[in-house]
Amino acid sequence: MELAEYLNESVVHIFRDATRSSKLNLKELRFLHRAAKIQKEAAQRRLQSDALGTSVPPFLIASIATRCNLHCAGCYARANHTCMDQSFKEEMDAKRWGELFREAYALGVSFILLAGGEPLEREDVLEEAAKTPELIFPVFTNGTLFTPAMLKRFDRHRN
């Protein structure tokens, strides 16, 4: 099995497993069924690119924040000096992140893991992610910055 086919099959398994675990949550099931259709289309775009000699991964990791509110032992971002207590002046703006999200979707990317620093520090980028409902954005967070308003936003924009 070629790498592109293997990765596409992995995406199918993710959706199958998520659907099984969401049987009692109708809102989640609707989201997953819609997303599964979109992911099949993305898989086709990846296979077409692969046939032309360009490999497009189904998953990307986007370090959207340079600041974090914690100092966790073993933090990879602090160890690599990509995370600090305040933002870098060169941090990419939310509009550009939104453009990158749309470009990734057009190529056939299915998931963009939002990491950092602490990604909840960048509500502006989270809003841009919500504007690209065709992609799924797992958020790698320490969870300490969740507010009731933010939880409502995540519920409203399930991607």
Question: Language-model segments: what does each one mean?
Answer:
Residues E134, R156-N159:
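Glycine-enriched alpha-helix->loop->beta-strand junction motifs that scaffold or abut catalytic
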Residues L3-M150:
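Conserved alpha-helical substructure of the radical SAM core
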